[in-house]
């Protein structure tokens, strides 16, 4: 049956699964690795901009990158999702983080625009993932609806 195929199954809350396990998929590990590289590049930015302005730019970008990673990790901990739309969204989130990493060295010039656009798209993709998870059959669907709304608003702000 198509609905039982792992590539097309909608997200499920981990509490709704009889035999939930803490298996980490390769895409999540690669997503983490891309964030590590991005933080490394951000550290290089700080080493070349040792003044207060460089520190505050570093701090702001670090917090944005950290929250992009943490929000995705929370989603992947709450929901079991192995279907094709989730994989495409994660691939796009990886591309947005690579764009952010490429924008960091010139963030004081034209790079800020690429950073902001990639970050906004990253937030919109996180909102999309929560929007898809709103169909769960328990109280967690309220959380998914609220998070989807919050991340869409945050994407619009950026």
Language model regions located:
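Multi-pass alpha-helical transmembrane bundle typical of ion/small-solute transporters
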Residues: 1-158
């Amino acid at each position: 049956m198509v609905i039982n195929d792992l590539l097309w199954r909608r997200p499920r809350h981990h509490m709704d699964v009889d035999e939930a396990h803490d298996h980490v998929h390769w895409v999540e590990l690669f997503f983490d690795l891309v964030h590590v590289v991005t933080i490394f590049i951000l550290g290089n930015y700080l080493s070349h901009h040792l003044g207060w302005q460089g520190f505050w730019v570093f701090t702001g970008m670090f917090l944005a990158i950290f929250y992009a990673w943490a929000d995705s990790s929370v989603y992947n901990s709450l929901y079991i999702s192995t279907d094709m739309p989730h994989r495409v969204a994660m691939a796009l989130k990886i591309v947005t983080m690579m764009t952010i990493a490429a924008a960091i060295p010139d963030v004081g010039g034209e790079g800020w625009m690429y950073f902001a656009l990639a970050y906004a798209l990253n937030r919109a993709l996180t909102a999309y993932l929560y929007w898809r998870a709103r169909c769960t059959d328990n109280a967690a669907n309220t959380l998914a609806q609220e998070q989807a709304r919050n991340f869409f608003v945050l994407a619009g702000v950026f």
